[in-house]
């Protein structure tokens, strides 16, 4: 199998995590082997000295005061994996689990967790062979790490549970055998190292970030199309306005809207003599709303990139001094905050998009035929797609309630404050999907609105977007079964095709226009 990304522990870029999520093949940088071996040898030395170290020769959680005999250390590590593999719910999507595996791999490879080189090699081999453990999506409170989801990963490594090989769902032992791999017998600390950490929450949050970024870029295109359909003004996007405020996301999104609308004949047709003084906020304030969403997404991205390159195990092994120190890096509060920010961003992206669709279907606001149909009354046109958009936006509003402000004590009050990062991060994919449908509906409505202005044409960029949609969805003349049209439009949003077809650099979490 060819490798397109080499993971360098502690130095993996956001672009590399995105590529991995999108299906790129990966392998671990061999340069980490020495640090991993030193870390494992440090744990062996601690065991030989007989000094008590949490999770190495003690029980777990509230049972940390129980000493474990040396001959039982392998059983201890197997037991923690089996007992903690207690997740429920639907399997986590394979791309997210692959992200989780890679995050765990690069964390362990930094040589602070005490795992054996062969354990790391097995995880690397599973990732490269396309063996993806079945990981139930529910059961983590985000401290002490993502115990249940990561335990299902660890269980597959010891031949327990299930795993996907391609589309096949197999017993984990059979999945390993499929690639001529042997289950591991875990040594001191290895089970705890595999299941302690924030990798599940971080993987879900990164997946959400990447999907929401795609949604935001598509929404800039549909927002510009809506301005054209309503014969709105591009004056609110003037660079001088946004420079005076200085918000970077606002400046970037305004620049994108200007570029998207450049050379539009529709815009020029009403530049002079338009009696309207100002457009509705949903058109005029796009840079302020979308820019704020972009800034929040960039802040979340920075947090997640740091987390993805960090070590969130406990205890941590310091080979230079021969110590294993107990701390709290497993507490996923940074991830929870980032997930909450992303939830707010995608909620607002969808919210202002729905308002534009509502504006377009209202002839009093848009100047277009009612519900964008040539014969309103006989036909209902876009009446109910706008209702669907409203329903999805309201669903996202409910989901946007911050998860990080919730906490519930666990493990007999030993683990008495938790982050709820997994809950906050898991919702993001569903929220992004809802928003993609909302923006897909706006795409249909805005292009339909532009069709009423024929023979006038929009800008080069927006005409490319119109052509992309019209290749799959014809202009609505009379009512037809709407569902396939909506699915086709949302697919253009989610795939990134809509943002790519305009051939203009659109702002994302890593770059400006």
UniProtKB/Swiss-Prot annotation:
GO BP field: L-histidine catabolic process to glutamate and formamide; L-histidine catabolic process to glutamate and formate
Reaction(s) catalysed (UniProt annotation): L-histidine = trans-urocanate + NH4(+)
Keyword Lyase set for record: yes
Keywords (A to Z) from UniProt: Cytoplasm, Histidine metabolism, Lyase
EC category name: lyase
Pathway it works in: Amino-acid degradation; L-histidine degradation into L-glutamate; N-formimidoyl-L-glutamate from L-histidine: step 1/3
Pfam families: Lyase_aromatic
SUPFAM superfamilies: L-aspartase-like
Residues carrying 2,3-didehydroalanine (Ser): 144
InterPro entries: Aromatic_Lyase (IPR001106), Fumarase/histidase_N (IPR024083), HutH (IPR005921), L-Aspartase-like (IPR008948), Phe/His_NH3-lyase_AS (IPR022313)
Placement of covalent cross-link 5-imidazolinone (Ala-Gly): 143-145
MF term (GO), any: histidine ammonia-lyase activity
EC number(s) reported in the record: 4.3.1.3
Localization annotation: Cytoplasm
KW Lyase (keyword) present: yes
Post-translation changes: Contains an active site 4-methylidene-imidazol-5-one (MIO), which is formed autocatalytically by cyclization and dehydration of residues Ala-Ser-Gly.
UniProt GO cellular component terms: cytoplasm
Main location: cytoplasm
Protein family (similarity comment): Belongs to the PAL/histidase family.
PANTHER family given in the database record: HISTIDINE AMMONIA-LYASE
NCBIfam families attached to this UniProt entry: hutH (TIGR01225), PRK09367.1 (NF006871)
Protein name: Histidine ammonia-lyase
Organism per entry: Xanthomonas axonopodis pv. citri (strain 306)
